[in-house]
Amino acid sequence: MKNILVSILVLASMIACTSKQTTTEGEDPNMVLFRENSKVVEAAFKAFSKKDLKEFATYQADSIKVHGAQFGGKDINKAEMLERSAIFFKLINNVNVKVTLLPGVDEVTLKPDGSVRAYVIWSADFVNNAPKTDLKSYFSFKLDKDHKVYDHDEYYDVSGWFQVASAAPAK
């Protein structure tokens, strides 16, 4: 009987001393994943607003597919996205972004899936001194196990932005 009692005490102390897992009971693991992924997305926006394409590229998977906002536009890859961004940077200075990040949801269950949605308001100075304007946009990012963006959807008024970017200088 004494051996059984000692065994129970040893077992109880082992159970009591085990370390707590990184997630608490009841916490959705996809919300934990969202928080990890949102740090990456936020860092990518900061790098982009600094016009630092080298750093920005580190947050993107080599296999990324970017689904642009242009009507009839085709999906582009990482090299094309970086080239397009470099052209964009020639048109603007002093890029500022206000970013609100929210968890993405599974289309069937409508529960968090670890992806990241971003509501963004952009402002910048156009090199041609066109009138300053804010551009509201929406993005959806899916990240891989290495926390790199592999799928990128974007929604914004492309034609309106180009209209302002090519406008006559403000007087």
Model-derived features: positions:
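Low-complexity, intrinsically disordered terminal/linker segments enriched in charged
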Residues: 150-171
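Exposed beta-sheet edge and beta->alpha loop/turn motif
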Residues: 117-146
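Sec-dependent bacterial lipoprotein signal peptides
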Residues: 1-15
